[in-house]
A protein has these predicted regions:
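Extended, highly charged segments
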Residues: 1-222
Length: 222
């Protein structure tokens, strides 16, 4: 894996880890709490003096090797696993509204969160064990009967149930609705759940491949 050479905080909600690969090239791993995670090679201005959170990251992660990137269940929480001579460190990035970025040791004791926060079901502050948000429903774990039970017990429309209760998000739930011949605002008790289930499974388990669109009506498999 790549080594972390430098940590920056160019914005109060953004952290940039500069990674050096085995071939010597640099790539920025950009973490935006509550929004997105991506890599970039763009040359961007960095603060002259590091913010306190960036200083903590530098102390723990400088020259650490990135060993793994893991998703916590089906939730929008990523765990970046780093390791150096001082031990193992986890950097959790919560990619949902009001999410956070949290540095822990190898036992998940919080070294420093980007922002201290308290919620109804958890607290994020230095010195306590990191607990992710309550686990969301994982559609990969459902069978048709449990799927029907979840859908029939919902008081939301089809799109909101797929997006919220099944944790698919707006875009994926809209695709399932369209493929099953339904509108997102459809009454969940008036749709054919067998067709919705078939469309969901096609999306989750189908062998999808990319396509390159060249001109109107022309495309080829990438």
């Amino acid at each position: 894996g790549s080594h972390c050479k430098k940590c920056y905080q160019p914005h109060y909600e953004q952290v940039v880890l500069r990674l050096r690969s085995k071939d010597g090239g640099n790539t920025d791993l950009v973490l935006v709490r509550g929004k997105r995670v991506y890599t970039s090679k763009r040359d961007r201005p960095m603060p002259q003096y590091p913010a306190p959170f960036a200083m903590v990251l530098r102390k723990s992660l400088t020259n650490a090797r990135l060993k793994a990137i893991e998703q916590i269940g089906f939730d929008r929480v990523l765990r970046f696993v780093f390791e150096n001579s001082h031990g193992r460190f986890h950097l959790y990035v919560e990619v949902f509204r009001d999410g956070n970025i949290i540095l822990t040791d190898g036992d998940d004791t919080i070294i420093q969160p980007l922002t201290h926060a308290s919620y109804a079901d958890r607290t994020l502050k230095r010195g306590i064990i990191y607990n992710p948000p309550p686990a969301a429903e994982n559609p990969y774990d459902l069978n048709f009967e449990s799927f029907k039970d979840l859908m029939n017990s919902s008081d939301r429309n089809l799109g909101r149930t797929l997006g919220g209760v099944l944790n698919l998000g707006a875009g994926v739930s809209a695709a399932v609705c369209a493929d099953s011949g339904n509108k997102p605002e459809a009454d969940i008790h008036e749709v054919d759940l067998t067709k919705v289930w078939d469309s969901l499974n096609l999306l989750l388990h189908g062998e999808w491949k990319g396509y390159l669109f060249k001109n109107e009506g022309e495309y080829e498999q990438a």
